[in-house]
């Protein structure tokens, strides 16, 4: 019990928390300054250079990535321009091929049309010639039939038909 009583006396005689005991503040401030200086030295010599190196490396990586992205963007623009040019060239080539094909087809068509026109003209001339021959033949046939009919009519009425008179009468009627 003596120790308990002695501990109780010490507790009763001490002013409270040791940090708030003004008699030890000088020592506390000294050790606080020493601790802060040591922490500052450790941070400035070890931790802060590592952090600065990491931040610098990160900034370099970001800068390199941005530069790479800009290069890729420029390459993409160049590729797009090359694509557009190739597309325009292909369209121009296609239009040229279409124009050539149209010209070839038109020339073939013109040749075929002129050939068909020549054939039609030749057949029309042949047909006109045949029609003229048929008309001439028909006119002669009509003339002969008219003469024969006139002779038969005269013979039917009891007269004797003079061939020269019948020919002259039929020719006169047919001509005018």
Curated annotation (Swiss-Prot):
It is a single-pass membrane protein. Pfam families: ATP-synt_B (PF00430). It comes from the Bacteria. The chain crosses the membrane at residues 29-49. GO terms for molecular function: proton-transporting ATP synthase activity, rotational mechanism; proton-transporting ATPase activity, rotational mechanism. It is found in: Cell inner membrane. GO terms for cellular component: plasma membrane; proton-transporting ATP synthase complex. InterPro entries: ATP_synth_b/b'su_bac/chlpt, ATP_synthase_B_chain. Gene3D superfamilies: 6.10.250.1580. Keywords: ATP synthesis, Cell inner membrane, Cell membrane, CF(0), Hydrogen ion transport, Ion transport, Membrane, Transmembrane, Transmembrane helix, Transport. F-type ATPases have 2 components, F(1) - the catalytic core - and F(0) - the membrane proton channel. F(1) has five subunits: alpha(3), beta(3), gamma(1), delta(1), epsilon(1). F(0) has three main subunits: a(1), b(2) and c(10-14). The alpha and beta chains form an alternating ring which encloses part of the gamma chain. F(1) is attached to F(0) by a central stalk formed by the gamma and epsilon chains, while a peripheral stalk is formed by the delta and b chains. Belongs to the ATPase B chain family. F(1)F(0) ATP synthase produces ATP from ADP in the presence of a proton or sodium gradient. F-type ATPases consist of two structural domains, F(1) containing the extramembraneous catalytic core and F(0) containing the membrane proton channel, linked together by a central stalk and a peripheral stalk. During catalysis, ATP synthesis in the catalytic domain of F(1) is coupled via a rotary mechanism of the central stalk subunits to proton translocation. HAMAP family: ATP_synth_b_bprime (MF_01398). This is ATP synthase subunit b 2. It comes from Roseobacter denitrificans (strain ATCC 33942 / OCh 114) (Erythrobacter sp. (strain OCh 114)). The gene is atpF2.
């Amino acid at each position: 019990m003596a120790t308990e009583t002695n501990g109780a006396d010490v507790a009763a005689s001490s002013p409270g928390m040791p940090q708030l005991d003004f008699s030890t503040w000088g020592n506390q401030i000294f050790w606080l300054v020493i601790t802060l200086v040591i922490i500052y030295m450790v941070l400035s010599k070890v931790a802060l250079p590592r952090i600065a190196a990491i931040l610098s490396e990160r900034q370099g990586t970001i800068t390199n990535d941005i530069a790479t992205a800009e290069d890729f963007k420029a390459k993409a623009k160049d590729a797009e321009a090359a694509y557009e040019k190739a597309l325009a060239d292909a369209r121009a080539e296609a239009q040229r091929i279409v124009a050539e094909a149209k010209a070839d087809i038109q020339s073939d068509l013109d040749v075929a049309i002129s050939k068909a026109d020549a054939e039609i003209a030749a057949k029309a001339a042949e047909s006109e010639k045949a029609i003229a021959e048929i008309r001439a033949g028909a006119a002669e046939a009509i003339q002969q039939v008219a003469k024969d009919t006139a002779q038969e009519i005269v013979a039917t009425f009891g007269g004797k038909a003079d061939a020269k008179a019948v020919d002259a009468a039929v020719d006169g009627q047919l001509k005018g």
